[in-house]
Amino acid sequence: MAIFHYISVLVPTTLAVATPYVLRRNGFDSERKYRWLLYVACLLFFISWYLPSPLIDGQDTSFTTHFVGGGLFTGLFWVYLVSSMKWRAHWPVMVFSVFALVSALGCINELAELFMVKAGLASIKLDDTNWDILANTLGAATIWIGWIIADFMMKKGRLSGDSGN
C-alpha cells in the first residue's frame, strides 16, 4: 500500500509544478489567474486516496477515490486548462473534450494499476474497473455541469469574475 502514498503526493506535485511551466512556455501567460483551480484539483487528488469508499453489490470498490481523485480532479484540471488557454467551442465539443480527458486519464490509471499488480508493487483487486470508469465520469460531469452553470450566471451578471471572453 505504500506505493499509493507516494502516488498521492508525486502526481499532484508534478502536475502543480509542470503544468503552469508548460502553459507559460507555450504563450498562455494568463494561466496564473486560474492556477488556484489547479491547486484545488491537486488537493482533491491527494485527499481522494484517504477517503473511504462504499461497498457496491457487496464488492469492495474505490468509488469515492475515483469520483473525487479521478472525476472531480480531472474536471477541475480541465476547467483550469480551458480557462488558461481561453479555449471555447460549441458545447458538444466541450463535453467531448472533458469526457475524452477523463477517459484517457482513467485508462492510464487502470493500466498503471495492472502494471503495479503484475510487477508485484501492489496487491489490489482489478475487478472494479467498471465502477472506476463510472465514478470518474460522474465526477467530471459534476464539474462540467457546475462550470456551465457558473458560466451562464457570469454571462447574466449574477456572478462576478471572468466570463472567459
Predicted regions and their residues:
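Short aromatic-rich membrane-water interface segments that cap or initiate transmembrane helices
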Residues: 125-134
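Bulky hydrophobic segments
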Residues: 1-125, 138-165
